[in-house]
Amino acid sequence: MTDSLAIIEQIHKSFDLKDFNSLAIPAKAEFFCSIDSVSQLQQALVYAKQQNLKITPISGGSNLVLAADVSGLVLHINLKGVSASTVVDNTVDISVAAGENWHDFVTLCLNNGWHGLENLALIPGNMGAAPIQNIGAYGVELSHFLQSVDVVNVETVQPEVLTDEDCDFGYRTSVFKQSALDKYVITGVNLRLSTQPVTHVSYPALADLLQGVEPTPKIVFDTVCQLRRSKLPDPKEIPNVGSFFKNPIVSKQQADQLMATYPEIPMFPLKGDFTKLAAAWLIEHCGFKGSRHGKVGVHHKQALVLVNFEGNGEDILLLAENIKTQVAEKFAVVLEVEPRIYGHTY
């Protein structure tokens, strides 16, 4: 088993995590270590096993809520590197380390003529979090391009490769949030992109802005950035984790009942007997959009975004629970929280 002695001097005690979560919550890690290589990760996992410490991997911190101080060993996954294969049949395979910034990578792809990810521009966070929730926006999801995920098994401390089928992707979910929760630490992601200028512009908000325009990948990229900046606050300026709730999926029967009462409610038909609803609309029509609740609140331009004004994790979760309760009472729809909660059963 990998020697863990070298890692000890790199581990910090009672480490402030405020700068490592985009909600800027002032929680502390009992122990903390920044991970720059797979071998260092293996050493840290061995050390955690020897000391009987629970491990908590984080990266960009853009999809988590720290409800309290985090016990055990927090691993900041900071692996870097992007490599591309030779182009074959108008496609290119790209391997990306888990610590690479997502938007910077999308920009790199655009500049290199690797296409497909333009709709996912400006999504906050790092590469390692992308497959966990199968990030998506404006009609495109990561799973459309993912070939495999490089991981280290927490129990065996050995590297493994999970195929796209192994990842069991769904709407904002994957095996990493379900049966393999806490089983792996993601170290890299392998994608296949097109070297031909393909675009995806069927999403209504995108289609409206591009009406009468011949969309190029650059135009789609710029338009998506424009849309996101117009609706979503920059976490560096107003701490947030982006969309706090998933868009709920209901039966067609329930959707029809809602439509009869609320003819203006946005709906998106899905395969089978299901319909996706706009969580932001439900929250806004419960009166939460732009509201402030002590040191936290709901953004004035996007009701899906909860923002932090120097509050703590419990403040955020109390607001989220209030929103869930009001939406359930008014619409009989259950909202599901998108970010992962640490230090609290929710």
What are these regions (language model features)?
Residues 2-156:
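Anion-binding (especially nucleotide phosphate/pyrophosphate-binding) glycine-rich loop
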Residues 13, 19-25, 159-314, 318, ...:
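Phosphate/pyrophosphate- and phosphate-bearing ligand-binding catalytic cores of soluble enzymes
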Residues 37, 61, 125, 157, ...:
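Residue-level signal for inorganic ion chemistry
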Residues 41, 102, 276, 320-321:
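Generic non-transmembrane alpha-helix signal with a bias for helix starts/N-cap capping motifs
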Residues 44-48, 206, 319-323:
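Short amphipathic alpha-helices in soluble, non-transmembrane regions
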Residues 50-54, 324-331:
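A common structural junction motif
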Residues 106, 279, 324:
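Generic structural marker for isolated residues within well-ordered, non-membrane alpha-helices
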